[in-house]
Amino acid sequence: MLILTRKAGESLHLGDDIRITVLGIQGKQVKIGIEVPGDMVVYREEVYRRVIEENRMALDISNADLLAATKIWHGRTK
């Protein structure tokens, strides 16, 4: 992990397309601005982790669920 020190109003760049600016500091809270290309998605860490977990749960399909869906699809439910 690269660790940098920035003051309010100072920025850093990630590649050519991403700019992160420290907008202000109040106590233990830092307000940052992030400039990214319009096609790039930016998530807060807690939101990103929730999205990943929900996607993982959506992919967890049991064999019984697949068998039931197959029977329904083919019209052979009992």
Curated annotation (Swiss-Prot):
Sorted UniProt keywords:
Bacterial flagellum biogenesis, Cytoplasm, Repressor, RNA-binding, Translation regulation
Q: Name one GO biological process term.
A: bacterial-type flagellum organization
Q: Identify the InterPro entries for this entry.
A: CsrA, CsrA_sf
Name the Pfam families for this protein. Answer: CsrA
- Localization annotation: Cytoplasm
Assembly and interactions?
Answer: Homodimer; the beta-strands of each monomer intercalate to form a hydrophobic core, while the alpha-helices form wings that extend away from the core.
Stated name of the protein: Translational regulator CsrA
> What is the organism of origin for this protein?
Nitratidesulfovibrio vulgaris (strain ATCC 29579 / DSM 644 / CCUG 34227 / NCIMB 8303 / VKM B-1760 / Hildenborough) (Desulfovibrio vulgaris)
